[in-house]
Amino acid sequence: MTLTQDDILNVLNTARPVSIVRAGDGEKIVLESNNSIESYQLCIQSVMKRQMGYEPTMSEVEAIRQNLISAYQGADIIGIPMQKNLAELNKHWKGVADTVKPHATTNKTCSIDIFYDMLYDGSLLEWFKDKPVINYISCRKIPFERLLVKQVNHFQIAPEVKFTSYTGEHHYPDQFNRIERWMDKCAIEGH
């Protein structure tokens, strides 16, 4: 079942917690990293070094893979590639849904770009307007404060290395482990 922007807004309007987990070509490559030595090497070169900026140990790669599987198993909705030019993209983009499906416990999907689509058309910021608390995790700063939000808690993760010259703390395990502790400290009524 494919959900539209309006469907996602309706889900958000229920005011119940919802988990929307992204599944892109990098996630597909990580999920397949235990298929063969070639798959593992592709994961290291195309995802870990390129996106994260370093080569984690084999056990860390497997832990990341298992965390992805847990995320898909616990997701309410999974964001998958739905670009108009999907047929023209590489096999990793085209095969995302098939690779993630065995790990998912939901059949609800939406566009991998749903957050950006809603951010750019204004519907996401409108939905957040006047919320008492917003807790979000992102490598980008979103101007929620201008929406009259009383409290904004932002855990800023490292950006993808391929887009920046970032040399700070590693995504995994450093930031990953701190996020759970950070979330525990945030207001429970956050959105």
Locations of the language-model features?
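Accessory, usually C-terminal, subdomains that scaffold auxiliary metal cofactors
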Residues: 151, 156, 162-191
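Electropositive, gly/pro-rich neighborhoods at or near active sites that engage anionic ligands
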Residues: 1-154
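Short, catalytically relevant binding-site loops at active-site mouths
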Residues: 141-143, 160-163
